[in-house]
Structures are given as C-alpha cells and as structure tokens.
Amino acid sequence: MNKLLAILLCVSMVLSGCTAVNDEIQDQVFDNFGCTDTNALNFDENATIDDESCIYDGPIEILEIADIEGCDNTNSIHCMLPFPSDAFLINDQNTTTGKRIHYSSTTIPNSGTVDLVEIPILNQMDGASPNTQIMTAFEKEPDISELAGQFSISKSLENGHSTQLINRITGELIPHWVELDIRSEEDQPTILHIRTIKALEHNTPYVVTISGLTDESGELVPTPEGFAALRDQILTSSMDIENRRAEFQNLFSFIEVNTDISIQQLQTAWSFHTSSTESIIGPIISMRNDALERIGEGGLGCNVETNEEIFDEQGNRSHWLISGTYTAPQYTESFYPPTLIRRVSVTDRTPVFVEDREIPFWLVIPGTAIEEPADLTIWGHGFLGTGDTSGLYGWANENNAAMLGTSFYGWASDDVTSLEYAVLDMNYFQHQAERLEQSMINQVVMIKSFMGICSDLPDLYLNGTSLVDVTEPVYTGYSNGALRGPSIIGLSPDLNRGVLWAGGSSFSHIIERCTQYDRFHFIFASEWGYENQLDRAVAISIMQSLWDSVESDTFLHLREEGYLDEVEPYELMTLFSIGDLQISNISSARMMRTANIPILDSSTIIPYGIEVVDENHSGSVGVFFDGGYILAPDGNEYGEEPHPAHNAIGALSSARDMAFKYLQFEDIVDTCNGDCSFSPDNLSWN
C-alpha cells in the first residue's frame, strides 16, 4: 500500500507540475516537456520532449525535502530566497503581464512584535519590482574577489563569469556587480547580492544563473538541495518543487540554448518577471487625473496665514516669507499617519476620493522680485523634513527665484513615529507608502493652484505688480527631494525640467548605505524587530514594490519617452557630491543610467556606462563634484557622521550657478571650468 501511495503521490506531483508552466514563455520559444513513454504511469500525450520524469511500476526513491507552505523550497536557507522569483508569481489573465504576485500568509517574515505579516495589496501587483534587490544565499560563503565589483562592472559581461543576469526575451546579458552582505551575522549564511546598475525593464522576464562559485579554499560552494533535485532529475517529497519541475525544465532549456553553461555546472538558477508600468503607476495616475479634474485649471483655493517681510542686518529688504494652505483633493482616509488610501475594492487598487483638505505651503519671495517677477521654483525637502523654504532666502535672492514648498508626507517630520513602528510591523509600510502617494498628488495640485487661483493672492503683489512669474514653474530638490523629483515632474502636467541635488535611485539599494538609516536600524534589528539580517534584507526588498509608484527609478525609466498620454518626457540636471554618506554615489550613478543622462566632461568621475558630453550639449546632464572628503565604505553599510559631503554642493556657488542657469535658461554652462573639484572652505548656502 505504501508503495502504491508513493507512486500515486509522484504521479500527482509530476502531472500537477505540467499545469505550472510559464505559458507566456513556453508559447514563445519552448516545447512541452514531460514523459513521452507510453509505457510509463505518467505518460503525457501533450509532451513533445522527454524530461526524464517518467514513472514506472517499481520501487521509487524519493528525496525528503521540507515542503514549507508559501515558500520557495528550492533554497532552504530562507523562505523567500532566491529573490525575486517566479516562485511567488501565479498566472492571471486579467493583468498586463499575465502574472500576479502571490504571497501567502506565511511568506513574509514575521517580526519579534508581529507573528503574521500580510500585505494583501502586494498580491495585486503583476510582477516583481524592476527596482528591487536581487539576492540568494549558500550554506558556505563564496569567494567573490574575482567577480565583478562596483568598480569592475564590465567583468559581469565576460565569458565564464560566475553570475549572469539575462533578459529572457532578448538573451541580452545585463551588466551588474556582486556583493556579499557585510551586515550578515557570523552564525548565519551570507546573502549574495547581484546588484543591477539601473532599473530593469518593465514587464520583462529575467533569468539568473550562478555557476563556478568557490569558497576561500577553492572548493565549489554546495548547491542548495532543492535546486539540485530539479537539476539532477531527482524526485522529492516537496509538492512545491515537483509542481515547478516543468517550469525549471523550460528554464534549463533556455540556459542551454542561450549560454555556454552546462546544466550540471549550475549551482543555482531562477527566473522572475518584472511588473508592468500599468501595475506600478496605474492607480496613482488615476488619482492624479481625478484630482486634476476636481480642481480644474485654476485650483480650488489658497489661504495665507502669515506674511513676514524680512530685512537683512543693514536694514534692507531681504525677502518675504509667506505661509498658508491650499486646497487639495484627498484620497487617504485621514490626514494623519498611519492611514491608507481608500480604494474601489480589495481587488481593485483604483483610489477613491475622500474629501478636500487644507495642505500647508511655504513661499519665499526674494527682495529682487521688485525689479522683475521671480521665477516660480518648486522645492523638494530632505529626509523627514518639511516644505518650509525659509532657509532658502539666499538661493532665492541670488537667482531671483520664488521658492515654494510643501511637505512630502510619508517621509516628513511627522512620520518618524509611524516609521519606527513600521520596522516592527511591516504592514505599516503600506500606510507610509500610500501617504507618500497622496503627497505627490498634493504637489501636483499645489503647482496647478499657484499657477491659477493662488497667483491672485494680494500677498504675491507689491503696489499692484506681481512678484512671482508663474508661467513656467521648474523643480529643484535636495536629498530626499531629489529622490522625489522624477515622480513629481513626471506626474505634474506643468513641469518639464528640474535640477536634482545629492540624489539617487531605488530606495532598497540606498537605505542600508545611508546614515539616515541609523535612527531606525537599532529598532529594526532588535528582538522586537528582525534580529536576522536575512529577514531584514528580504523585508527591505519586498517593500520596494510598495514604494515603486513614486520611486525615482520608476519615473526615471520613463524620462525619455514618457508613458502613453499620461507622463510626458522631461529633462534633468543631476548634481552629486563625491563621498556622500546619505545617498551613495553608487545610487547616484544608478539614477543617471536609469534615466540615460549623460555626464558633463568636467565631472570628477565618469561612472561605468555613461556617455560624456561637453557644455554644448542640450538636454539632460549630470555632474559629480569633489570636495576631497573621506569616501563612503565599499560595503552595504553607512559611514560615520558628521560628514559634510552631502550638503556641501548646495553651499557651492559654482554648483548653484550651474543649476539655476539650467532651470531658468535651459543652458548647460560649465561653471567648473573643466574640473568640478572644489575646496571645502568658505562654503555657504546663503
């Protein structure tokens, strides 16, 4: 009886595996794999290529492998490794990709505070984030000293490189670099990161292969047992593995055809499919469009609460500081955190209007505006700050720019407590992400309102003459404001140009190298959070899907061609500081590559894969300035503050001059005179 049950079990496993084939990819290039022997118990009349899975009446050996519900059982080190993976995708004909994420109630790691972490909205995404981390782990730590690193990226394209990232549609090798997680605990396996150098294509299948990895003694790193069973055609007790056997046969066939790697050389391999643009930004585009329809061309209203005329030490007028509120349609249930966006249903992410609310703004009008109206310049503030522009009076007067700001709720000063709780209960990262989405709509509405109804406020006039030119607003943002810039410019129909200072892209790639992470890491890594770095790394990577709707990578990816009639192309100048400990230069270079922004020839570094141009170039451009500061650590850890590099370029007059010539005249002017090195002495923001 036991023998018969074993046979029936194996038959059900293999047959169920035939239904789990990636239909889209198979239809494109692959035959049907299965048992072609009519004498076998599991003969498959639809199979065209035998996959050596035939089962016969006789003794059957089954490898015992733990089958953990909701996990990728090909790697027993962690439920969600490798990541991202098709293990967490199911077919769904109602999505753009034909796929949908499926995390069960046991998939996402629990914390020391919360036993069950479920974020149902993730299961509405139609693929993996194109901006997230790619990673796996082995029982023995590999020696990666000869692999592509952050300063030797081109190695990843060489024959025989141990890691490959392949576009499954085109067969193209994707440049990347390899890094071991420096934060791993000594008694735990070390995560191996495959670092992409820019955002991946949307709605695209990718393949990862790893082969030839050795440890420090030169011995091959052991293959995870679950993957080895698939590679070596060994039947297992894991329903998950058996259900995915045909999928892996398709994967192995692709690898054999498109690489020089033999299947037996593989130490692991997996595939994943990125989400579509529609899935990533469709809901926020819907929210933006609804808000614009509600406010009309001129906006709903503005109220001034304070208007201060500020004088300098000599008694001369310096500037006006105006604060107040503007009226904006709201889609979150509450103004205060934690809060979620109201949506059509649990299966439809379309936002639903809740009410109009008054949103604070700050406006600095320079004293120079009495001679000529100041250009309306939208300001993006730093991490966990506010939209208060009062400290920008020097920038304003220097460039005759009216600096208008509002807060990035979600990453604003009043979000600190909710973020501290979110690292203990990841459910609340959805609240944080959706509050940030609402803040992007607030930005769009503020710009439209100040071009319309708010421009008629008496406080914006002196002796009947307007102090602010609202006809062609531009954007500039620093740090977090630079990260938010691409989404604001992309979402606003009134912006087409911006300057981003000390920015980068892909929050999940930025955060562990950022000194701002320090204030949350202690709680995150505590016994109440996630004591295991494997869990922390996975958690950060999962959350990227929540942040993607306003992620800089997402809208940088759309910069040149836009998206349908919803996002227009736009131009950027990106300015960075060598040695930045808050936004790593790695992430800054990623920002440029994702947006396909060339670099000015006076830049102090030329990152891999970026075109070099001179000041006669028109369009987008980037520059790295170097004040000779101590460089950031190489690994995924942050350096030691205080460290001046991050804020230095905002205090550098040549950088400000370059930025505002670009904003106001669309000119690229090499204010560095061929070399953007600078002395850290006598820098001033005002």
Question: Where does each model-flagged region fall?
Answer:
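Secretory targeting signatures
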Residues: 1-27
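A conserved hydrophobic secondary-structure block that centers on an alpha-helix together
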Residues: 184-211, 215-216, 349, 354-393
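N-terminal cap/lid segment of alpha/beta-hydrolase-fold proteins
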Residues: 303-373
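Cap/lid segment of the alpha/beta-hydrolase catalytic domain
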Residues: 334-358, 370-462
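C-terminal subdomain of alpha/beta-hydrolase-fold enzymes, centered on the catalytic histidine
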Residues: 435-438, 496-497, 501-686
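Primarily recognizes the serine-hydrolase "nucleophile elbow" in alpha/beta-hydrolase
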Residues: 455-512
